[in-house]
């Protein structure tokens, strides 16, 4: 709900600050006083394009600001949270238009684009009467209103989910197809696999091959080492280890009886001779196993060379070649299965399309019923509002393609015939601001109780009417004001008398320059203003009495 509006150096306004409450607020005043400037200011705060002509003569810039109260779950609050502009429970819009033509905008004291300002304003205020900023002229907004009237949230959610699922499957298929023909890639990898599969790439086998290569490469040195070690341990000369151990054992045996501790030494020497014998036996076995085989060594080196060449090619170690081979085999298998996967995706896409059509059909049925009901109710109201023979038709038009659309199978177009015999035309093509305001009023009254924009502004709604029709227009605006905040600029006393709150705009000459001023009227001032609207500049007793009667009738409603 709009709580506060500040207008500075805007057109003929120097500085005004207005407070607004719930219900219906009317704005009246003499012709040319600037009644519509409030609505113009709200339009610019809603993102309308502006030029320097709106800046008061002699001022450097015009400054506009508005403050709205919004609940935590209000769509405007959700929008603010999504763009990280939320601030407590209030929403502040600010716009500066410079005399040089420049313009800047803020939401909650943070700079924003006019597009962002406009997006937020669609959740805050609906201005009826000027084509350039009337959300109801948008076909998307018409569809939103129709769906709200139909109360088909469940059906809409089902359609949106079905469309999203279909789109996700389509994206997956497109991604697969974007990879192109896999035959070349398969042939290339299969050639590499054949190369790898020629070799035994088992890591244990490669480890054993390396060990065998080391032995073959050092066989001569191993044989020589075995011979020398055997000679050292048990040679023919008296300096071999085994001969010396025997000599030492013999020397001790002659004196052991004199010191029992020497028996332990004898035991250790016996063990040493046993271990030397075992070492000699193992050396003999190893020596016999060692054979110099140049052909076998060459074969081993060739195979190791091939393994290292493959490892360099695939940028891994020889021990990792088996894992590389398995990865490539898996990739080939995956690519071979792509056609199968694409066929499965096509089947799932077809099923998703069927589910969307089923959901969209249910949504279309609810919309068709709601369109008929809303059209009938609105048509009756249009005729009540002085547009005899007028008719509203709500047309559901199929989308041009058969792709699942998240909004369903059709678009909406509100068509209006304002006079008998005239063909219905799109609502957005109505030339008369007064007719457009009354049609909008009829639609809004027909849709009472729906969760629509909280603040509704009507300009020119009473253009070209009077008498009983004016009274009906006032009643409908008053009824709308019971559930929404309504701001109405009017020149008709029957409409002005229906407001909960009344502002008067007047022209005041200051230093030879005409300026607009606005004031909130109390009950006495209000009666005087309505009497002026009834009788002109010179207020008669009859006009004063008639004004009092209009206000009294409101209290008795």
UniProtKB/Swiss-Prot annotation:
Q: Single GO cellular component annotation? A: bacterial nucleoid
- Disulphide bonds in the chain: none
Q: Which GO terms describe its molecular function?
A: ATP binding; ATP hydrolysis activity
* Keywords recorded for this protein, A-Z: ATP-binding, DNA damage, DNA repair, Nucleotide-binding
Q: Which residues bind ATP?
A: 29-36
Cite the SUPFAM superfamilies for this sequence: P-loop containing nucleoside triphosphate hydrolases
Q: What processes does the entry annotate via GO biological process terms? A: DNA recombination; double-strand break repair; SOS response
Pfam families (alphabetical): AAA_23, SMC_N
> Mind telling me which InterPro entries this protein's record contains?
DNA_recomb/repair_RecN, P-loop_NTPase, Rad50/SbcC_AAA, RecF/RecN/SMC_N
Q: What does this protein do?
A: May be involved in recombinational repair of damaged DNA.
Q: Hey, which family's this protein in?
A: Belongs to the RecN family.
Record-given protein name: DNA repair protein RecN
What organism does the record attribute this protein to? Xylella fastidiosa (strain 9a5c)
Gene, per the UniProt record:
recN
């Amino acid at each position: 709900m709009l709580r506060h509006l500040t207008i500075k150096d805007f057109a003929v306004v120097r500085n005004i600050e207005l407070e607004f409450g719930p219900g219906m607020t009317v704005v009246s005043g003499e012709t040319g006083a600037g009644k519509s400037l409030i609505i113009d200011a709200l339009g610019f705060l809603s993102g309308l394009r502006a030029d320097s002509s709106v800046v008061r003569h002699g001022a450097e810039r015009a400054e506009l600001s508005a403050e709205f109260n919004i609940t935590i779950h209000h769509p405007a609050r959700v929008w603010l949270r999504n763009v990280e502009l939320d601030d407590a429970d209030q929403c502040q819009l600010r716009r500066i238009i410079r005399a040089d033509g420049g313009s800047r905008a803020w939401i909650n004291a943070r700079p924003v684009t006019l597009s962002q300002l406009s997006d937020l304003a669609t959740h805050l205020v609906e201005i009826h009467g000027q084509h350039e900023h009337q959300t109801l002229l948008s076909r998307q907004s018409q569809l939103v209103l129709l769906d709200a009237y139909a109360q088909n949230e469940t059906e809409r959610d089902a359609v949106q989910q079905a469309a999203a699922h279909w789109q996700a499957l389509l994206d997956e298929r497109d991604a697969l197809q974007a990879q192109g023909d896999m035959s070349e890639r398969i042939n290339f990898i299969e050639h590499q696999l054949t190369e790898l599969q020629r070799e035994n790439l088992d890591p244990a086998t490669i480890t054993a091959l390396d060990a065998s290569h080391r032995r073959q490469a050092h066989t001569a040195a191993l044989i020589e080492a075995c011979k020398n070690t055997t000679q050292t341990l048990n040679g023919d000369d008296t300096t071999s280890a085994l001969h010396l151990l025997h000599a030492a054992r013999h020397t001790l045996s002659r004196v052991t009886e004199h010191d029992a501790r020497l028996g332990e030494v004898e035991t250790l020497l016996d063990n040493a001779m046993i271990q030397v014998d075992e070492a000699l036996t193992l050396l003999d076995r190893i020596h016999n196993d060692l054979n110099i085989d140049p052909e076998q060594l060459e074969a081993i080196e060739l195979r190791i060379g091939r393994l290292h060449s493959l490892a360099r090619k695939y940028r891994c170690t020889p021990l990792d070649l088996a894992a590389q081979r398995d990865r490539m085999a898996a990739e080939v298998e995956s690519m071979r299965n792509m056609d199968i996967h694409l066929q499965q995706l096509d089947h799932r896409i077809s099923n998703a399309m069927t589910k969307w059509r089923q959901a969209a059909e249910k949504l279309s049925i609810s919309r068709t019923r709601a369109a008929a009901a809303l059209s009938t109710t609105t048509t009756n109201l249009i005729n009540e509002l002085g547009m005899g023979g007028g008719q509203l038709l709500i047309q559901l038009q199929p989308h041009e393609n058969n792709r699942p659309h998240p909004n369903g199978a059709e678009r909406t177009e509100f068509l209006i015939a304002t006079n008998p015999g005239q063909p219905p035309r799109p609502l957005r093509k109505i030339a008369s601001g007064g007719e457009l305001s009354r049609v909008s009023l009829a639609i809004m009254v027909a849709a009472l109780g729906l969760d629509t924009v909280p603040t509704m502004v009507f300009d020119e709604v009473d253009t070209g009417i009077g008498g009983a029709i004016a009274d009906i227009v006032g009643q409908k605006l008053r009824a709308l004001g019971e559930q929404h905040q309504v701001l109405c600029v009017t020149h008709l006393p029957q409409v002005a008398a229906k407001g909960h709150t009344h502002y008067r705009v007047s022209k005041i000459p200051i230093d030879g320059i005409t300026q607009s001023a606005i004031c909130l009227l109390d009950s006495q001032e209000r009666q005087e203003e309505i009497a002026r609207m009834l009788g002109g500049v010179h207020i008669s007793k009859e006009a004063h009495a008639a004004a009092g009667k209009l206000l009294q009738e409101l209290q008795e409603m």
